[in-house]
């Protein structure tokens, strides 16, 4: 949950963050669930960024702004299903906003801007089309979802799904304690995150691995480091170890890997292979951190 000003269309936390174009608010705050906003494939540009409030213009003769999905997603999550099928002009809008953290609208005599800081979440079938590299790089982590091959695991999935459909409330009650346990662990990890010690060797390993896979820019190193720190905090560690880097490397870097038409291995396998070679080189050079090698 987040603390917001009552009536703020952009989920502002303080009066200073409340935009000038919006109706005044009292300054009273309320707690609300962190927003999770769906961006449908057929959404128009006006629906995404916002547009002139036609009803207010016609009934009152006032030129007012009607916020879009980006305003609702501020301080929350923006989810896009089939993100690889998103229209190019919407992709361009998202790239601009993701870069600046601000939504700027200048049209129809309006000049509006507001905060638009959100976590971008997307899903899609890569067989239906590729995602533009510029947008793909804006995703911090990438995970390949596959059907389980283990028979017992598949049976358990079927059993749980059947139980959910038979009695949703009973199913949720059954797992309520486990959910609470995970939630508490995440909250504890948030408090501990700032205390994690990061050795210089960890920074070197991040940089070497990103160079080895041909990652452009520094977003790969930063994402890898942040994710490894989050894992270390979640597990209660005090120092970032090489094993933490190893376990999150594929999520942070697989979608940043340069394509090799002659290599039939999946992107995850290629990241782990490059990581193993990188760490071996690091160890041969006399540097050591943690207990495990990347890819080992």
Where do the model's predicted regions map?
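Non-catalytic alpha-helical coupling and interface elements of nucleotide-dependent molecular machines
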Residues: 1, 10, 53-54, 75, ...
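Conserved ASCE/P-loop NTPase catalytic core
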Residues: 1-150
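Conserved AAA+ ATPase core "coupling" helix
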Residues: 45-50, 131-190
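Alpha-helical scaffold segments in soluble metabolic enzymes
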Residues: 47, 93, 157, 205-208, ...
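Short, surface-exposed helix-loop/turn micro-motifs enriched in polar/charged residues
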Residues: 86, 110-112, 131, 198, ...
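Non-catalytic, well-ordered alpha-helical scaffold segments
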Residues: 92, 133, 137, 200, ...
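Conserved AAA+ ATPase small/helical "lid" subdomain
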Residues: 169-224
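C-terminal engagement/docking regions of AAA+ P-loop ATPases
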Residues: 207-219, 230-296
């Amino acid at each position: 949950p987040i603390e917001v000003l009552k009536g703020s269309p952009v989920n502002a936390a303080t009066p200073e963050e409340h935009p000038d174009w919006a109706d005044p608010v009292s300054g009273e705050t309320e707690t609300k669930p962190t927003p999770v906003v769906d961006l449908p494939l057929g959404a128009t540009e006006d629906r995404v960024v916002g547009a002139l409030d036609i009803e207010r213009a016609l009934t009152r003769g006032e030129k007012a702004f009607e916020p879009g999905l980006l305003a609702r997603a501020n301080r929350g999550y923006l989810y896009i299903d089939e993100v690889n099928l998103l229209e190019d002009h919407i992709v361009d809008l998202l790239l601009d906003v993701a870069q600046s953290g601000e939504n700027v609208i200048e049209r129809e005599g309006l000049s509006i801007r507001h905060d638009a800081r959100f976590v971008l979440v997307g899903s899609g079938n890569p067989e239906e089309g590729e995602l533009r590299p510029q947008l793909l790089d804006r995703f911090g982590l990438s995970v390949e979802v596959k059907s389980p091959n283990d028979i017992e695991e598949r049976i358990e999935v079927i059993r749980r799904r059947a139980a959910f459909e038979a009695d949703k409330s009973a199913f949720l009650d059954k797992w309520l304690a486990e959910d609470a346990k995970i939630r508490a662990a995440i909250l504890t990890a948030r408090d501990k995150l700032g205390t994690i010690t990061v050795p210089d060797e960890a920074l070197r390993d991040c940089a070497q691995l990103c160079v080895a896979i041909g990652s452009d820019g520094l977003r790969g190193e930063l994402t890898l480091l942040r994710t490894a720190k989050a894992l270390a905090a979640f597990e209660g560690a005090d120092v970032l170890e090489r094993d933490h880097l190893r376990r999150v490397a594929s999520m942070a870097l697989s979608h940043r890997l340069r394509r090799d038409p002659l290599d039939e291995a999946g992107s995850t396998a290629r990241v782990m292979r490059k990581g193993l070679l990188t760490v071996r080189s690091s160890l041969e050079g006399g540097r050591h951190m943690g207990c495990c090698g990347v890819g080992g």
